[in-house]
Design a protein with these regions (language model features):
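Short, well-ordered coil/turn elements that cap or connect secondary structure elements
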Residues: 35, 61-63, 84, 121-123, ...
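Residue-level signal for inorganic ion chemistry
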Residues: 27, 58, 90, 131, ...
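Short, well-ordered beta-strand core segments
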Residues: 38, 89, 164-167
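Catalytic phosphate/metal-binding cores of nucleic-acid and nucleotide-processing enzymes, i.e., regions
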Residues: 5-10, 84-85, 113
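Conserved P-loop
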Residues: 2, 9, 13-81
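Helix-adjacent hinge/juxtasegments
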Residues: 61-110
Length: 183
C-alpha cells in the first residue's frame, strides 16, 4: 500500500528504491496529496517497445491534474523552467537521466553539480525519483561499475540538499531524513 502525505511538500524530496519497488507511485502520491497533481518531468526516452509500454503505464496511472514535460538531458534547466510555488514538480527518474548523460558523453560531475545548484533554491516543491542501485551485485563491466558509482554519488548529492528522503521497499515507504523546510 502506498501511503500519501498528509503534510505540505518540503522544498526537495528524494524518493529512492529498487526496480518495481513502488517509488514512482509513492512520489506521485505525495504530489497528489499535497496539490492534486503537478508537473511530471520525464527523463525516459521510448527507445524500444518495452520502454514505450512503461512510459504509457506511468502516464495512464496519473490523473488529469498532471502535465507531462519530457527532458532527457537538460534537467537543471527544466527544473528552473517548470518548478512553481503552486505546482509541484516531480522528476522521474534521476538514474535514467544519469544514463542519458553518460551515453551522451557529458561530464557527470559537472551535470550533477548543476542539478544540485538548481535544487538548492527551487522555485517550488520538487520531488525526485531515483533508483538505489548499490544494493545488488557488483556489475560485471567497467561501464556498469561506473554507472553504479555515479548513481551513488548522484543520490548522495541530492539527498544532502533534500529536506526529505524516503526509501521505498516492497511498496512501503521508509523515511530516512525529514527536515522542517517547506514551501
Amino acid at each position: 500500500m502506498i501511503r500519501k502525505a498528509a503534510m505540505p511538500l518540503p522544498n526537495v524530496t528524494l524518493v529512492l528504491g529498487g526496480a518495481r519497488s513502488g517509488k514512482s507511485a509513492h512520489a506521485e502520491g505525495l504530489v497528489e496529496a499535497a496539490a492534486g497533481g503537478g508537473t511530471y518531468l520525464a527523463t525516459a526516452e521510448a527507445g524500444d517497445e518495452e520502454m514505450a509500454l512503461r512510459i504509457r503505464r506511468h502516464r495512464d496511472r496519473r490523473g488529469p491534474g498532471w502535465t507531462t514535460v519530457e527532458e532527457p538531458l537538460e534537467l537543471a534547466s527544466a527544473l528552473a523552467a517548470h518548478a512553481a510555488p503552486d505546482r509541484p514538480l516531480l522528476i522521474d527518474c534521476l538514474t535514467l537521466w544519469l544514463s542519458n548523460v553518460m551515453a551522451a558523453g557529458r561530464e557527470t560531475q559537472r551535470e550533477r553539480a548543476g542539478l544540485v545548484a538548481a535544487l538548492s533554491a527551487p522555485n517550488g516543491p520538487v520531488v525526485l525519483v531515483s533508483n538505489e542501485v548499490g544494493l545488488g551485485l557488483v556489475p560485471e563491466t567497467p561501464l556498469g561499475r561506473a554507472f553504479r558509482d555515479e548513481a551513488g554519488r548522484l543520490n548522495q548529492a541530492v539527498a544532502a540538499v533534500a529536506s526529505r528522503v524516503v526509501f521505498v521497499a516492497a511498496g512501503i515507504p521508509l523515511t530516512l531524513k525529514e527536515e522542517e523546510r517547506t514551501q
